[in-house]
From Swiss-Prot:
One of the Pfam families matching this protein, by short name: URO-D
Keyword Lyase: yes
GO cellular component: cytosol
MF term (GO), any: uroporphyrinogen decarboxylase activity
GO BP terms, alphabetized: protoporphyrinogen IX biosynthetic process from glutamate
UniProt organism field: Salmonella arizonae (strain ATCC BAA-731 / CDC346-86 / RSK2980)
Annotated localization: Cytoplasm
Name listed for the protein in its UniProt record: Uroporphyrinogen decarboxylase
């Protein structure tokens, strides 16, 4: 593979020295960019965009042409794995993702296949290989998956949810069925991420978007336990380099110590966690990624720069920080405000790296 020209992001995840704090944005390839909207229109619909390696590569690279980002992230969706489990994924206008055949009981779980990542999910691996080729070693490529718990919420609820009553009913009334589902998902995600790594992903991230809706005890048993299983099963070296793993639980700031015990390299923080406090608690063990409120990008440029300065100061001197938003960038953010954010991180962070 091509020599990596900018490895700041990988070095920061491994708590190694860097010249400036690396930065990327969750959902950096997305609807806030007019060029993304044009490519999506060309594809026809969202999943067609995900399943076309050339177009998925194009939208992955679009933000890198605008901004000096330190990493690219595979353009895909967390629901590719449930989709490959034959649940009939479709997207309802204004409703988000839906499944025609949600999981309702143990018998449904027993019928679910574990997808072959180079077969049913081969389009994702083709996208990874295409993106790696087109990146030409400029920056590393991040692969990702949803966490078992987060994927299960969509599969059991039949789509997006606000109250999560259907999956919580299963969790409390039929925990055995839910554990079987989560175990099958953990195996599927491990295979899926390892295939992404073999195809060229240089770091991987597990998005536990809905872990924060659980009690502390349920989080341990139904979310973190299965992410730990995945981390244990991942390839941690490929192409002569360590492959760092980041865990991100939205709303999980109270569980950082337990998350840091999984063997991951870094933890993603949402904007509700104080980064100085997080570093005091787990900075000796893991790197931290985050954590500006994505809505801050609506503010005037000077206010965005102030917030970047505050977060950099909160983390303080030394290595182990990847700057990011605390969740995905909003679709109506002015693209030039994202540019202000990225430039400010690089310019203002040099003083923290000697």
């Amino acid at each position: 593979m091509t020599e990596l020209k900018n490895d700041r992001y990988l070095r920061a995840l491994l708590r190694q020295p860097v010249d400036v704090t690396p930065v990327w944005m969750m959902r950096q390839a997305g609807r806030y960019l007019p060029e993304y909207k044009a490519t999506r229109a060309q594809a026809g619909d969202f999943m067609s965009l995900c399943k076309n390696a050339e177009l998925a590569c194009e939208v992955t690279l679009q933000p890198l042409r605008r901004y000096p980002l330190d990493a690219a992230i595979l353009f895909s969706d967390i629901l590719t794995v449930p989709d490959a489990m034959e649940l009939g994924l479709y997207f309802e206008a204004g409703e988000g993702p839906r499944f025609t055949a949600p999981v309702t009981c143990k018998a449904d779980v027993d019928k679910l296949p574990i997808p072959d990542p180079e077969d049913e999910l081969g389009y994702v691996m083709n996208a990874v290989r295409t993106i790696r080729r087109e990146l030409k070693g400029e920056v590393p490529l991040i692969g990702f998956s949803g966490s078992p718990w987060t994927l299960a919420t969509y599969m059991v609820e039949g789509g997006s949810s606000k109250a999560f009553t259907v999956i919580k009913k299963m969790m409390y009334a039929d925990p055995q069925a839910l554990h079987l589902l989560l175990d099958k998902l953990a195996k599927s995600v491990t295979l899926y991420l390892n295939a992404q790594i073999k195809a060229g992903a240089q770091s991987v991230m597990i998005f536990d978007t809905w872990g924060g809706v659980l009690t502390g005890r349920d989080y341990q048993h139904f979310s973190l336990y299965y992410m730990h299983k995945i981390v244990d099963g991942l390839l941690r070296e490929n192409d002569g380099r360590r492959v760092p793993v980041t865990l991100f639980t939205k709303g999980g700031g109270q569980w950082l110590e337990a998350m840091a015990e999984t063997g991951c390299d870094a933890l993603g923080l949402d904007w509700t966690t104080d980064i100085a406090d997080a570093r005091r608690r787990v900075g000796h063990k893991v790197a931290l990624q985050g954590n500006m409120d994505p809505s801050m990008l609506y503010a005037p440029p000077a206010r965005i720069e102030d917030e970047v300065a505050t977060i950099l100061s909160g983390f303080g001197q030394g290595e182990g920080h990847v700057f990011n938003l605390g969740h995905g960038i909003h679709q109506d953010v002015p693209p030039e405000h994202a540019g202000v954010f990225v430039e400010a991180v690089h310019r203002l962070s040099a003083q923290y790296h000697n």
